[in-house]
Swiss-Prot record:
GO terms for biological process: tRNA methylation; tRNA wobble uridine modification. This is tRNA uridine 5-carboxymethylaminomethyl modification enzyme MnmG. FAD binds at G13, G14, G15, H16, A17, G18, V125, S180, Q370. It comes from Shigella dysenteriae serotype 1 (strain Sd197). InterPro entries: FAD/NAD-bd_sf, GIDA_C_N, MnmG, MnmG-rel, MnmG-rel_CS, MnmG_C, MnmG_C_subdom, MnmG_C_subdom_sf. It holds the Pfam family GIDA. NAD-binding protein involved in the addition of a carboxymethylaminomethyl (cmnm) group at the wobble position (U34) of certain tRNAs, forming tRNA-cmnm(5)s(2)U34. Homodimer. Heterotetramer of two MnmE and two MnmG subunits. NCBIfam families: mnmG_gidA (TIGR00136). Its cofactor is FAD. The gene is mnmG. One of its GO terms (molecular function) is flavin adenine dinucleotide binding. Gene3D superfamilies: FAD/NAD(P)-binding domain, GidA associated domain, C-terminal subdomain, tRNA uridine 5-carboxymethylaminomethyl modification enzyme MnmG/GidA. It comes from the Bacteria.
Length: 629
């Protein structure tokens, strides 16, 4: 039977991609249905209890700037907050928070249940309704059919998921959850390229069996950072420390002597694992010269005794896992409460997607999260938001939107996936972005909130706060520009006391702030330049904008030069054999990838600058030289 009411957008899966997709579509006013196999696991942290980190924190801030959920949820659930790379420049600083799993899940579910235009329904999905190469709905395991104008697949590791512990394996979407086998089979019938990937998780330890007295503590930052531009530290729950231990030669001997029982090394697992989150087996074998690896013991929550030992992801048999755990300092009597495991799952080649994350072959079908070959909650959330907003726009007969590489880490992520694809789980790093100085955590709202407002993602409260911040920045910069001190002024002595070289000519507040030894906080304690802004976010922007003004202007010039050709569109139906002068290799790669723009084409391995020049000349001759907005 068909459900009596049609929807604009259906989201299949309630993880980090699915929840952001559902919230985005509903915020934009579209009638949205979120289908999940279990309402109680909405927003579940399947692996590590943490949000953020290098590159990942940037994505969370961008999701927040577009009105998303993740930053707000972690501000309510974070039990330890830190700024990574705090001593480095603002481009690579990143926020990271340990999470209380239960509080995080509660925050996500509360937000979903209070979101207008959003309905949640508990049933596993087994089929899609496809009519004339267009997806128009979904079918649940009890045969109930839902119709919609767009469908977003955010199914994580559930597609034909297979869990491995030692040489034993069984079907599962993650520990304790069933896999999605009928849906996997259905998707394999569609004109989509499919592959297998693998990820893993460490055993969980009973905190009561760990001797923390012999371990080093790691505390969070004080004052505590916040993730959301709308948040403040008073929202954070009680803060707790993490602890550090290490593997040792005994640990490594245990691993090496049991590799024949590892499903990876025995050839049982076919899927490729994440390069930047390797199993402890991989670390020991790949870095054979190292006699120890640092392991972080991270609490899973304020009301839980479970500890997440970050750094020993493994699929070795349980008896070997026990030996590994008990070989480390402080863990000699530790008890495992959940075994570690590896999981293999289907993913679909993201090169078959448009930058909006809609399928090139099936109209109305969007993909987001691990199904696209990524790893990580943050990467999933960012894709979910993009897929959700574009599904909403499609259902409203509007053009899709995707950020440029120069505009957001989300733009880098999507462009990398859609242009280059991936053969291993993709993780975001700041090093993947060409324009890191422009794509900082601190200015994510300045880059994206206005666009989010135009798209219908940003509510009135966030918009008002954003405009107030802009006004504070502009007003303060004008004040510092117009407030000046001369070497002969009475205030000069007070100013000189904070400078490595005394004033030799008249200087404005901005001139002084550009000096390496001067900070905004210090400057605004000086009589001529007091008082400081009470808006800490605006104050941070004033300092960064002034200190890095020259570098930022130079990078903006680079972006504008690059964008002249970046946005030149390539016809989706173009057969590159028509373009004379291209090599057979380039023709084959362009016909295989079908890039949407010259920018995408230029990033395909083997497509040379000379080939790009030939393409531009050909487009001009054909009268097809068009640029996207």
């Amino acid at each position: 039977m068909f459900y009596p009411d049609p929807f604009d957008v259906i989201i299949i899966g309630g993880g980090h991609a699915g929840t952001e997709a559902a919230m985005a579509a509903a915020r934009m006013g579209q009638q949205t249905l979120l289908l999940t196999h279990n309402i109680d696991t909405l927003g579940q942290m399947s692996c590590n209890p943490a949000i953020g980190g290098i590159g990942k924190g940037h994505l969370v801030k961008e999701v927040d700037a577009l009105g998303g959920l993740m930053a707000k949820a972690i501000d309510q659930a974070g039990i330890q907050f830190r700024i990574l790379n705090a001593s480095k420049g603002p481009a690579v600083r990143a926020t990271r928070a340990q999470a209380d799993r239960v509080l995080y899940r509660q925050a996500v579910r509360t937000a979903l249940e209070n979101q207008p235009n959003l309905m949640i329904f508990q049933q596993a999905v087994e089929d899609l309704i496809v009519e004339n190469d267009r997806v128009v709905g979904a079918v649940t395991q009890m045969g109930l059919k839902f119709r919609a104008k767009a469908v977003v697949l955010t199914v994580g590791t559930f597609l034909d998921g297979k869990i491995h512990i030692g040489l034993d394996n069984y079907s599962g979407g993650r520990a304790g959850d069933p896999p999605s086998i009928p849906l996997s089979r259905r998707l394999r019938e569609l004109p989509l390229r499919v592959g297998r990937l693998k990820t893993g998780t460490p055993p969980r330890i009973d905190a009561r069996t760990i001797d923390f007295s012999v371990l080093a503590q790691q505390h969070g930052d004080n004052p505590m950072p916040v993730f959301s531009f709308m948040g403040n530290a008073s929202q954070h729950p009680q803060q707790v420390p993490c602890y550090i231990t290490h593997t040792n030669e005994k640990t490594h001997d245990v691993i090496r002597s049991n590799l024949d029982r590892s499903p990876m090394y025995a050839g049982v697992i076919e899927g490729v694992g994440p390069r930047y989150c390797p199993s402890i087996e991989d670390k020991v074998m790949r870095f054979a010269d190292r006699n120890q690896h640092q392991i972080f013991l991270e609490p899973e929550g304020l009301t839980s005794n479970e500890i997440y030992p970050n750094g020993i992801s493994t699929s070795l048999p349980f008896d070997v896992q026990m030996q590994i755990v008990r070989s480390m300092q402080g863990m000699e009597n530790a008890k495992i409460v959940r075994p570690g495991y590896a999981i293999e799952y289907d993913f679909f080649d993201p090169r078959d997607l448009k930058p909006t994350l809609e399928s090139k072959f099936l109209q109305g079908l969007f993909f987001a999260g691990q199904i696209n070959g990524t790893t990580g909650y943050e990467e999933a959330a960012a894709q979910g938001l993009l897929a959700g907003l574009n599904a909403a726009r499609l259902s409203a007969d509007k053009e899709g939107w995707a950020p440029a590489r120069s505009q957001a880490y989300l733009g880098v992520l999507v462009d990398d996936l859609c242009t280059l694809g991936t053969k291993e789980p993709y993780r975001m790093f700041t090093s993947r972005a060409e324009y890191r100085l422009m794509l900082r955590e601190d200015n994510a709202d300045l880059r994206l909130t206005e666009i989010g407002r135009e798209l219908g993602l940003v509510d009135d409260e966030r918009w008002a706060r954003f405009n107030e911040k802009l006004e504070n920045i502009e007003r303060e910069r004008q004040r510092l520009k117009s407030t000046r001190v001369t070497p002969s002024a009475e205030a000069a002595a007070e100013v000189n006391a904070h400078l490595t070289a005394p004033l030799s000519r008249e200087a404005s507040g901005e001139d002084l702030l550009r000096r390496p030894e001067m900070t905004y906080e210090k400057l605004t304690t000086l009589t001529p330049f007091a008082p400081a802004l009470t808006d800490e976010q605006a104050a941070e922007q004033v300092e960064i904008q002034v200190k890095y003004e020259g570098y930022i202007a130079r990078q903006q010039d680079e972006i504008e030069k690059q964008l002249r050709n970046e946005n030149t569109l390539l016809p989706a139906t173009l057969d590159y054999r028509q373009v004379s002068g291209l090599s057979n290799e380039v023709i084959a790669k362009l016909n295989d990838h079908k890039p949407a723009s010259i920018g995408q084409a230029s990033r395909i391995s083997g497509v040379t600058p000379a080939a790009i020049s030939i393409l531009l000349v050909w487009l001009k001759k054909q009268g097809m030289l068009r640029r996207s907005a």
